[in-house]
A protein has these predicted regions:
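Alpha/beta-hydrolase active-site loop
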Residues: 117, 127, 144-162
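C-terminal subdomain of alpha/beta-hydrolase-fold enzymes, centered on the catalytic histidine
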Residues: 210, 215-224, 228, 294-480
């Protein structure tokens, strides 16, 4: 990775006010490096954090005030999306928008009237190698780049933060997005463990998982033990509902009906394969075409097996458009014959190409000055670490880590937030995970939103997601 700076630990302070639920809330901020050292005292890496503290809280009430640690995924992604997407007191402004409902340049920020700072202090986290966080010694990357090393570094940071600001007694929450759900479940499981090589003794009151990556496989990229086509079916049906309007039902009703078909008739048809009677096969083809919008030719060529990557070029093929992996509502033109689809892949996603410029413009151009951040250090929004990432978690999976944390902490609750149009982390995989794990159902909440991978995008969604997380932090059922 190219560098434009020499690392020097930094700390910046700022202050501001925001009106939340009719009350003017003053706050102060600390943005700082959290440096890791080797045995000789040499800095080897840093996590960068942005802390927001409500300023008018009585000293005796600070310890009982919740702390929310928010982060994104990747691995290799900064906290930018959750920071200016919905958690921070400044957010992206949806003023003049394009046909997908996303802002047009020039990009602007506005006060986030849905921020949770009135009820909790906020800590946005750039893990090692992301945002302003740095890996300073490449030979030490194995200490940070992997499911368990990443969680260990995160827990070490949390311990230091709690000690620095005397917040050990505060209720603690994790808000993770995408791979951040893997991080959150691993951190919660590891933090509650005793008798290990290192007992961190950090437990959490609640986890919010946005764009779920907690699975019963070793990691999210594993093939599921049943046909992935069945797990993808609810999301593909939602995308078809949005673009092709096959039914007057709501998206929730249409998806529920589609899931019922996929879990029964479609699953059995895939299992039987070529032994299907012709009449039954014809019925399955008609139903799959209706629910997902694909063509007969596609299904016959694929032996009835849907595949979500190819699906993105099929669902609105008649319009010459391709739908996004991150948000199936957002489209781009299909590639012409001279362009190689496999060469560009996820790097040419129509949603991500729109998200990143306006989020980074607002964060770097407006939020950082408000936080008092003045630095030549390059802000690394995202870079892929998959090739360097160690996915071994000693034979366990992420749902087992989360189950263990909830078993050891009987008051801990988990709230799963998923967009109906998220083809990247499909809600069907979440349903399957919950049906095949030991998670306590009375403390687990699931809600779908009319959005994509970043479920909070858009004026209606940021309000809905923020209000539901607010209810969750207040101890209520966020799905009611």
């Amino acid at each position: 990775m190219l560098k434009t700076d020499i690392f020097t630990p930094s700390r910046f302070v700022g202050e501001g006010t925001v009106t939340l639920r009719g009350v003017k809330v003053p706050y102060h901020t600390v943005s700082e490096d959290n440096v890791f050292y080797d045995d000789e005292g040499k800095p080897i890496a840093s996590i960068f954090s942005y802390s927001y503290f409500r300023s008018d809280v009585a000293a005796e009430d600070v310890k009982s005030r919740p702390v929310i640690f928010g982060f994104n995924g990747g691995p290799g992604t900064s906290s930018m999306m959750v920071h200016v997407g919905f958690l921070g007191p400044k957010r992206v402004k949806y003023g003049e928008v394009d046909h997908d409902g996303l802002p047009l340049p020039p990009y602007e920020s506005c006060d986030n009237e849905h921020c949770l700072l009135d009820i909790a202090d906020l800590v946005l986290v750039d893990p090692v190698g992301t945002g302003f966080g740095r890996l300073l010694d490449e030979s030490k990357k194995d200490m940070f780049y992997g499911i368990e090393p990443d969680a260990e570094a995160f827990l070490t940071f949390v311990q230091a933060w709690l000690a620095r600001y005397n917040r050990w007694e505060s209720p603690k929450y994790l808000v993770g997005e995408s791979y951040g759900c893997t991080r959150a479940s691993t951190v919660a499981g590891m933090g509650s463990l005793s008798g290990s090589d290192r007992a961190y003794s950090v437990t959490f009151d609640g986890l919010v998982m946005i764009g779920n990556t907690v699975t019963v496989g070793k990691h999210f990229g594993d093939k599921s033990p049943i046909y992935s086509a069945v797990l993808a079916f609810p999301t593909l049906a939602a995308v078809n509902w949005y673009h092709n309007h096959p039914s007057n039902q709501t998206v929730e009703e249409f998806v529920a009906e589609a899931k019922g078909f996929a879990d029964t008739e479609y699953l059995l048809a895939l299992y039987r394969g070529n032994s299907l009677e012709e009449e039954t096969r014809e019925h399955i083809i008609e139903r799959v075409m209706y629910y997902t919008g694909v063509s007969r030719e596609y299904l016959e060529r694929r032996a009835l097996v849907l595949e979500d990557v190819e699906y993105r070029s099929q669902v609105i093929r008649q319009k010459g458009r391709y739908v996004s992996r991150l948000d199936g509502r957002i489209t781009r033109p299909l590639y012409g014959p001279l362009l190689d689809e496999h060469k560009w892949g996820a790097h040419d996603d129509p949603a991500e190409g729109k998200y990143n410029p306006f989020f980074q413009s607002v964060l770097c151009g407006e939020v950082f000055p408000m936080l008092g951040i003045k630095t030549d250090r390059n802000f690394v929004n995202s870079h892929s670490l998959w090739s360097s990432w160690n996915n071994d978690i000693k034979g366990r999976n992420t749902s087992e880590s989360l189950s263990a944390a909830m078993r050891r902490t009987p008051t801990m609750r988990t709230f799963f937030v998923n967009g109906w149009y998220d083809i990247c982390t499909q809600i069907g995989i979440l349903y399957y995970t919950l049906d095949h794990s030991d998670l306590p159902k009375d403390r687990v909440f699931v809600k779908g939103y009319e959005s994509g991978h970043m479920a909070y995008l858009g004026e209606e969604n940021i309000k809905a997601v923020s209000n539901d997380i607010y209810a969750f932090i207040m101890g209520k059922n966020p799905t009611k």
